Amino acid sequence: MEPKRKSGSLAKHDLPQFYLLIMLYLAQGIPVGLAFGTVPFLLKSLAKETSFTSLGIFSMATYPYSLKIIWSPIVDSLYNKRIGRRRSWIIPVQFVSGFVLWALGWCISQGIIFDGVDDAFHNRGNGTLHSVSIKNLTWWFGLLVFLCATQDIAVDGWALTILSKESLSYASTAQTIGLNIGYFMSFTIFLSLNSSDFANKYFRNIPLDHGFISLGGYMKFSGMLYIVITIYIIFCTKEKPYVEYLPKVEPINTSDGGSKPISIEYDDGDVVSTQNTSSIKYIYRCFIKVLKLKSVRSLAFIHMISKFAFQCNEAATNLKLLEQGFKREDLAVTVLIDLPFEIIFGYYVVKWSSDKDPMIRDNRRLRNSTGTNKVIKFLVGDAGVLTPWLWGFLGRLAAAVLGSYVVKQFPKDGEISTGYFCLVIFQHLLGSFMNTVQFIGISAFHTRVADPVLGGTYMTLLNTLSNFGGTWPRLIIMSMINYFTVYQCTIPGTNKVYVTHGGSMQACTELLNGTVTILRDGYYITNLICIVVGLFLYFGYLKRKILHLQSLPISSWRCT
């Protein structure tokens, strides 16, 4: 008899598909890292007078990633049967994405877009920005994120069928590993290798004015990587490696143009029912049914409000450190340290999120046998599938509190001590790790409750709500920081002093050649508001509702 596989472990026959998903999510993480991290970083570090409102406007480039549900049913229903439902979209979208990345990289290298960011690499200047058009940057990177979001719809749907049922929970692990590696490549690793200070300090005997990799060069390399991955998908993959149809049955047409259900059998013996998923009308009708489910509406509301509590910390803390003089290559190192932790512990968070895993049962017994039961129950309630999400929420709140302390304690003389550097590392490690705990926990829950019949549409709906919950507050948060901040502008050679409430530093430094002094920093006020709102939301609503949702049967999430 074949030895029984351990509960919760990845099946060996699913390893090729698992690695393929990692590569697809890695490719997706490249433009995400550029739009969400690198470009705002470069804008703030190369032009410190860039206002937080301008950064908030650029954040609109990330909106397609949060609005992809609008065209998700189209991606789910229109496809070439010979190529496959998911490959029909992944292949052309990745080809176009690769071309756009390469073309955008070429334009940046030539100074046509993002003028000045690569000047030091081409002997055109010292690397300072030249009147960058935030509007143009937003449009170009918005296009890139739109393509990335479309690819994400297809990959999320593919993850539901490319893995066997026994390994389905590892789709969220592949997503976490791939997205993190791609994000770190485009954000942390790129910023380190792009920095002249980093290269001169650690690798060069003779200092130069530029780092190892330019932004344009990196984007052209990323475009070629997209093409290589796409060629592999064309020639080396199948749409359904472990899914076989039962004996062929001709669909029976119904009055509404659809078809009666057909059974699909997976290799692991699970049988699900499907209909004519090539009908856009059918997919949209099912989509509306899903939105009407009480459980989905409750989860949607949670997604829309839960991330407000951390937005100031995660969007502005690193930028405030840059503004005060923290070197971007040092900040990149703090982010780099986090990568192995997220990959290693991601596996255990998946097991933690499985209600079939012994870890949860052991956790329940531990609560009943220790004196910490009351404290734990007060904080996260009874153990369940979403317990990691609850702990992650509290951990990110703690990281937000620590973020204000880290910015406040920045050395007045600008000299970074080892102790302070370790404090920055710890704060970032806490925040990003707890973010990963929440992400894997909720992704595993999404995979568990999503209806395989709807494939990418259902997963995209849940993931879109989660993403948009972290996107919509960002412009508001950035505007709040600007509004609550009071600047003093001193004009040299005169006795004139202007006090601006919620104004722009750029007007003072560029138009008046003045010196800016911050009298009141709106970052602290905004972060405090977010934390207080988060505490009220968690103990007043979120914890209670999450405990209810995780106890619902799978039938509460299905419309087919």
Curated annotation (Swiss-Prot):
Segments on the Extracellular side according to the record's topology features: 39-54, 110-139, 194-214, 351-374, 443-521
Cellular component per GO, a single term: membrane
Keywords of this entry: Membrane, Transmembrane, Transmembrane helix, Transport
Chief subcellular location: membrane
Entry's Gene Ontology BP terms: acetyl-CoA transmembrane transport
Keyword Transmembrane: yes
Topology feature Cytoplasmic, residues: 1-17, 76-88, 161-172, 236-329, 396-421, 543-560
Top-level division of the source organism's lineage: Eukaryota
Subcellular locations according to the entry: Membrane
Membrane topology classification: Multi-pass membrane protein
Transmembrane feature ranges: 18-38, 55-75, 89-109, 140-160, 173-193, 215-235, 330-350, 375-395, 422-442, 522-542
Pfam families: Acatn
GO MF, one annotated term: acetyl-CoA transmembrane transporter activity
InterPro entries: AcetylCoA_trans_1-like (IPR024371), AmpG_permease/AT-1 (IPR004752), MFS_trans_sf (IPR036259)
Protein's name in the database: Uncharacterized membrane protein YBR220C
Organism: Saccharomyces cerevisiae (strain ATCC 204508 / S288c) (Baker's yeast)
Lineage start: Eukaryota, Fungi, Dikarya, Ascomycota, Saccharomycotina
